[in-house]
From Swiss-Prot:
GO terms for molecular function: DNA binding; DNA-binding transcription activator activity; DNA-binding transcription factor activity; DNA-binding transcription factor activity, RNA polymerase II-specific; zinc ion binding. Residues 580-589, 610-627, 692-703, 725-748 have a biased composition (Low complexity). The lineage of its organism: Eukaryota, Fungi, Dikarya, Ascomycota, Saccharomycotina. Induction: Up-regulated during growth in alkaline conditions, in response to various filament-inducing conditions, and during oropharyngeal candidiasis. Induced in both white and opaque cells. Induced by SFL2 and repressed by RFG1, SFL1, and by NRG1 under non-filament-inducing conditions. Also repressed by linalool. Expression is also regulated by BRG1 and EFG1. CDD domains: GAL4. It is found in: Nucleus. This is Transcriptional regulatory protein UME6. Residues 1-20, 102-155, 164-183, 318-348, 401-470, 580-759 are annotated as: Disordered. InterPro entries: STE20_Ser-Thr_kinase (IPR051700), Zn2-C6_fun-type_DNA-bd_sf (IPR036864), Zn2Cys6_DnaBD (IPR001138). Disruption phenotype: Leads to attenuated virulence and defective hyphal extension in a mouse model of systemic candidiasis. The gene is UME6. Its main location: nucleus. One of its GO terms (cellular component) is nucleus.
Length: 843
């Protein structure tokens, strides 16, 4: 029963409607139109209309395509005729460029990128590039191609229409209607990159060129006389093969400026007509006639030639390119192999002015180990610059040759070198006579030495170099005989000049001691002859030759530290040389200003105090009775270390000075075995004769007060009445010292070093007690754990904690017992490698 009248326009139910509140009512017209009968008929009518329209569209499209194909064929014929008549084939501004090729698929939704496959290598069919015929796009901002202007001719207008119509075609029909380009077309944009070759119109020329593909890898092509090696040539001319068009429209053959590097199978361009001789053959290059003389032993003689290059082009182009690049032009033809050295031509370029100087007889007498001036630390050359340039250009000087003569003009222009007090060594300095980079190869077998740097050599580690310096400064090496005919080299005096005498400074001696603290003393069996020494003469005049070395055996000659560099005998000859061992490590360190080297002993390492300019050999003159005695220094050993406890030392300075003095006492032990004693006149004066003996050849860096204090401490602690004592006193004091050290070592045992645990956490909480006291991680295997089984131990798995776990003493005993068992077990297993049977029995 309907209780409410529903109007046709009502879309919602009334409040009292039996329908729900969400019910929506529709009009009768809507209901009738949405009936299933009427909806199906309506859809059928729509489908019929769409099918009819599609059929009409397809018919129209097919007709249009047929018309377009006919028009395209006509326009192709007209295009060929017009292009054959035109001088410039690319007068059409609407011809497509590679930039247009990038946009052709974006602008045409019907076309897709479908390039054709390049032909095989052995085919001679002309290749049609897919990049040469698509619709032109002149304005890239507008996605639609613009129509050609009205000023164009009918043929060009038709060509533009054909191009536009082809864009709307599918890609299959478009590929069919593409006009085939002429074989002699030229493309301006491609001319900068790719050769315009008719049969190989593709960027990857190496894969399409028949000649290039055959010639790069086939060696039989080298034989020009063999007709079987001649491969089938393609349709292109050899004269046009290597022709590169540079955008010019002229048809004249141009000289090639780009060559393809066919050796590495790439399109790399080689500039400046450089022919790649690494190529296997010349067949890939057009216009090249190769004879057997250029290719190998097989055919006639002659040089290769190119048809596109004129006779005078090679020389003119090479000279022009060499002027631009700054490199000398190579010869036009390959010269025969040179019979002389290859570096003689480069020598002649630089040594035309300076004639090569021949070696003299004096150069052959040069000793190989003669000291060099430039090997020293303080050598500075005062020669003018032009001498170095002349000497560096000469290739005949090696490291050990002698400059036979210097030009007279250079001698006159260098008075500093002639008047210099530094002696001119006849051995060649490295940085002056270093062979230049263009020197001949017969000099290069010599050792190449680095140019000496004064800042690098001015260190305390260059011991031998400074020794050579003093040798060259004090007494120059006599390399020439008495009948020396070369008078152009000034021989310096054998003694130092007064200028060097004034530069005497004992601060250098202080530097000596500063550096010597870090060096071990390795000097023994040193002998001094100081009979004829006078301290006043030595201090006043350094021109006196240093004392000679005498009384030295051949065995001890190797480790000598000489007194003054080179000792001069009575006849003036060289009687000894400086030792180059560690004993004379820095004895010439104080001679930075050309000072003569004193005989310096490093007995007092206290270098914190400044040195006092006390007389060097004053104590030596007071103890003149020690004329022919030997002062022997031994290495620091156990004996000197055990005797450090001989005296009760209270200050740190005495502790630092004591081991050096103990060495002298050890020396006196060896020297006094024959019953000879020393004078002790100076004993109460503060300096014992033993200490004086040590300081007779060195400037003492401590005052006499320190030596008195040292002597008093030695007398009080030694138990004997004298500082050095006689033979019996020294022996008794030495024995007492040994007993004291032994007693102190037994009474005060060494504190055992604490070792960290060999295994960190996690430690075993349930393992055997042996692994727990050894701080090892036990694997908790119940019969016997792995650690105990490895070393043959008895595993302890007792439920209660053993006593050796809590008690330290018992634990130490248990650990020692375990270690002994472990060592025995390891000795049994590893007896062949490490231990012998005697060691096992001793264990």
């Amino acid at each position: 029963m309907i209780t409410h009248m529903v109007t046709p326009d009502s879309t919602s139910s009334a409040p009292n409607s039996p329908y729900g509140e969400d019910t929506i009512k529709l009009n009768s017209s809507v209901i009738s139109s949405s009936s299933p009968v009427r909806s199906t008929s309506y859809l059928q009518n729509l489908q019929l209309q769409q099918q009819f329209s599609q059929l009409q569209f397809l018919q129209l499209q097919q007709q249009q395509q047929q018309q377009d194909q006919q028009l395209a064929l006509q326009q192709q014929q007209q295009q060929q005729q017009s292009q054959s008549q035109q001088a410039q084939p690319y007068a059409n501004p609407y011809f497509q460029t590679p930039i247009d090729q990038l946009f052709q698929f974006d602008n045409n939704p019907n076309s897709s990128f479908n390039p054709t496959r390049p032909p095989n290598i052995h085919t001679n069919q002309p290749y049609v590039s897919p990049y040469l015929h698509s619709a032109p796009l002149t304005n890239h901002s507008d996605l639609q191609p613009q129509p050609p202007p009205a000023s164009l001719s009918d043929s060009e207008l038709g060509l533009g229409l054909v191009k536009q119509q082809q864009d709307s075609l599918p890609p299959q029909q478009q590929a069919q209607s593409q006009p085939t380009p002429l074989l002699n077309q030229q493309h301006p944009f491609y001319n900068e990159y790719i050769n315009d070759m008719p049969s190989t119109q593709h960027p990857y020329l190496i894969f399409n060129n028949t000649n290039a593909a055959h010639s790069t890898t086939s060696l039989p092509n080298l034989d020009a006389a063999n007709p079987s090696s001649i491969l089938p040539q393609s349709a292109l001319n050899q004269s046009e093969y290597y022709k590169v068009t540079n955008g010019s429209m002229s048809n004249d053959p141009q000289p090639s400026t780009f060559l393809y590097n066919l050796h590495n199978h790439s399109a790399d361009l080689v500039m400046n007509n450089d022919l790649e001789f690494s190529n296997a053959s010349f067949d890939s290059i057009g216009g090249v006639s190769v004879s057997a003389a250029a290719t190998g032993a097989g055919a006639g003689a002659g040089d290769y030639s190119h048809t596109n290059i004129t006779s005078n082009f090679a020389q003119t182009n090479l000279h022009s390119s060499s002027q631009q690049s700054g490199v000398l032009p190579p010869p036009p033809s390959l010269p025969p192999p040179p019979t002389s050295l290859p570096s003689q031509q480069s020598q002649n370029q630089y040594l035309d002015v300076v004639p090569p100087q021949q070696l003299t007889n004096n150069a052959l007498k040069t000793e190989a180990n003669s000291p060099l001036i430039t090997d020293s630390a303080n050598f500075t050359t005062s020669q003018p610059q032009f001498e170095n340039t002349i000497l560096e250009q000469s290739p005949i000087f090696s490291n050990n040759t002698i400059l036979s003569g210097i030009d007279e003009p250079s001698k006159e222009k260098s008075p500093n070198m002639l008047n210099s007090t530094l002696p001119l060594s006849k051995s060649t300095p490295h940085h002056i006579y270093q062979p230049s980079s263009s020197s001949s190869s017969h000099v290069r077998h010599n050792k190449i030495t680095k140019k000496s740097s004064l800042s690098r050599l001015n260190t305390s580690s260059k011991k031998n170099l400074r020794a050579n310096l003093v040798h060259s400064l004090s007494t120059p090496t006599e390399l020439d005989d008495a009948n020396n005919n070369n008078n152009d080299i000034v021989t310096p005096p054998k003694t130092l000049s007064p200028l060097l005498r004034k530069k005497t400074s004992f601060i250098n001696v202080k530097k000596e001691n500063d550096i010597d603290d870090s060096h071990d003393i390795n000097c023994k069996n040193f002998s001094i002859d100081i009979d004829d020494m006078d301290d006043e003469d030595v201090l006043s005049d350094f021109s006196q030759p240093p004392p000679p070395i005498g009384g030295v055996s051949n065995d001890t000659m190797r480790s000598l530290a000489p007194v003054g560099g080179v000792g001069l005998g009575s006849s003036g000859n060289i009687t000894g040389y400086r030792s180059l061992s560690n004993a004379s490590s820095t004895s010439s360190h104080g001679s930075h200003h050309g000072l003569p080297v004193m005989n310096i002993f490093r007995h007092n390492p206290d270098s914190t105090k400044p040195s006092t300019p006390s007389p060097i050999l004053s104590t030596a003159s007071s103890s003149s009775t020690l004329s022919n005695k030997k002062v022997v220094k031994k290495l620091r050993g156990r004996k000197s270390k055990t005797k450090m406890n001989k005296s009760s030392i209270k200050t740190e300075q005495v502790v630092n000075e004591e081991p050096q003095v103990k060495n002298y006492k050890d020396d006196n032990d060896n020297d006094n075995d024959n019953g000879h004693g020393h004078d002790h006149d100076d004993e109460n004066g503060g300096v014992s004769s033993d200490v004086g003996t040590g300081s007779n050849s060195t400037p003492s860096t401590t005052t006499k007060g320190k030596k008195m204090k040292l002597n008093v401490d030695l007398n009080n602690g030694g138990g004997s009445g004298t500082g050095s004592g006689s033979c019996s006193d020294e022996n008794t004091s030495g024995n007492g010292t040994n007993t004291n050290t032994d007693s102190t070592s037994t009474s005060n045992p060494m504190v055992k070093k604490k070792h960290t645990r060999r295994r960190l956490l996690p430690r075993s909480k349930k393992g055997c007690w042996i692994c727990r006291i050894k701080h090892l991680k036990c694997d908790e295997v119940t019969p016997i754990c792995g650690g105990c089984a490895k070393f043959g131990l008895q595993c302890d798995y007792s439920s209660e904690k053993p006593a050796y776990v809590t008690d330290k003493i018992l634990r130490q005993k248990k650990l020692t017992e375990v270690s002994l068992i472990r060592k025995r077990n390891q000795a049994k297993t590893k007896i062949s490698r490490k231990k012998s049977s005697n060691d096992i029995t001793n264990d």
